[in-house]
């Protein structure tokens, strides 16, 4: 599945579209800066991934805020500083709520919605999508041959995951990023 068109403003007030990532392998997440739960390990995992691939100009991260009324470019900029987000190809984006929710729920098939009944008042997926250099969402097969389309980003690095799994989803994700980055080097 191809990444749909998007156009939002990032933490530097730059306009970012899917073409910003053209020719790059990149990750997609939906988050919000006031998230009291899964965003914390998700973004710590992404910082770990950022630091692993920091010298590769063909890698990027696209983070879309599901709380755009609060998450202005200034708030997103402060968030980058507090989390150690330094990669110029990691864009934290904000824009029209309806467009962001449409991108999440329809474009990437990842949950994003308001929910006043839970802590933080927003509900969203803790999964990352991996996109290849041609703009296609990529997947791999699990041990049973089923497609693994998304990667669990909400498990803290090094923490036990699902019983019986030997390799963390973040390690698998980094392996898949490496495969895509090295695909054209052969």
PLM region spans:
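Structural micro-motif
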Residues: 90, 101, 108-113, 123-129
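Short loop/turn microsegments at loop-to-beta-strand junctions
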Residues: 3-4, 26, 125-127
